[in-house]
């Protein structure tokens, strides 16, 4: 809430800009046969976590849901498994994407990272192949909780690990996802 004008700015963005715009957009989408709109939570956006997604959804329409990308929540220091539980019924899509908090760097500078993703050596967190940030036990629990909350949709692999070749990253991620997703 510092500086003092920030709460007013955020309230203005929600109440005078975002909610009215989304109400109109949802009506337009419905008129054109759209059934779901999935927003990906991402740092520095108005809708960046489960609480802000649910705020928008509750104010506008339940056709708005989350494209749950666990890597973004990990990079913000949140727990994607707890987030999945909170978002029960509001998860419309899931990304298979991992992130790693870089020990020794995040401990000093925190998680608000603005360096280019290409600076993997000095960033406090990095996108990594699935299983290279969170272990397979974590991924199995994540997918199990998704099932418990009713999610039975697709998982899109996003491989943005710049510490290995694309081929190695894809193979590592595919293997980890195959071992983690119960069929």
Ranges and model annotations:
Residues 166-183:
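C-terminal helical cap(s) of enzyme catalytic domains, especially alpha/beta-barrels
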Residues 2-4, 40-44, 69-73, 97-101, ...:
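Active-site beta-loop-alpha junctions enriched in small/polar residues
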Residues 37-39, 64-68, 92-96, 153-157:
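Hydrophobic faces of well-ordered beta-strands that scaffold small-molecule active sites
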Residues 7-11, 124-125, 159:
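A short, mixed-charge helix-start or loop-turn motif at secondary-structure junctions
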Residues 46, 55, 75, 163, ...:
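Conserved, well-structured beta-alpha core segment at the onset of a catalytic domain
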Residues 28, 55-56, 145, 176-179:
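A generic secondary-structure signal
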Residues 15, 50-54, 73-151, 167-168:
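Gly/Pro-rich active-site loop or hairpin
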Residues 1-65:
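Active-site acidic/histidine proton-transfer and metal-coordination neighborhood
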């Amino acid at each position: 809430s510092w500086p003092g004008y920030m709460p007013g700015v955020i309230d203005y963005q929600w109440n005078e800009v975002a909610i009215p715009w989304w109400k109109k957009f949802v009506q337009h989408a419905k008129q054109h046969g759209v059934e779901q709109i999935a927003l990906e939570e991402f740092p520095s956006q108005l809708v960046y976590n489960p609480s802000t997604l649910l705020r928008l959804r509750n104010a506008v329409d339940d056709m708005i849901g989350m494209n749950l990308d666990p890597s973004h929540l990990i990079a913000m220091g949140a727990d994607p498994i707890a987030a999945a539980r909170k978002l029960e019924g509001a998860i419309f899509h899931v990304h298979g994407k991992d992130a790693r908090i870089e020990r020794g760097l995040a401990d000093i500078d925190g998680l608000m990272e603005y360096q280019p993703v290409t600076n993997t050596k000095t960033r406090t967190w990095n996108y990594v192949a699935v299983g290279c940030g969170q272990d397979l036990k974590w991924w199995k629990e994540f997918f199990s909780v998704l099932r418990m909350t009713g999610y039975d949709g697709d998982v899109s692999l996003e491989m943005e690990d710049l510490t290995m070749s694309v081929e190695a990253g894809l193979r590592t991620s595919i293997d980890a996802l195959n071992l983690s997703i119960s069929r």
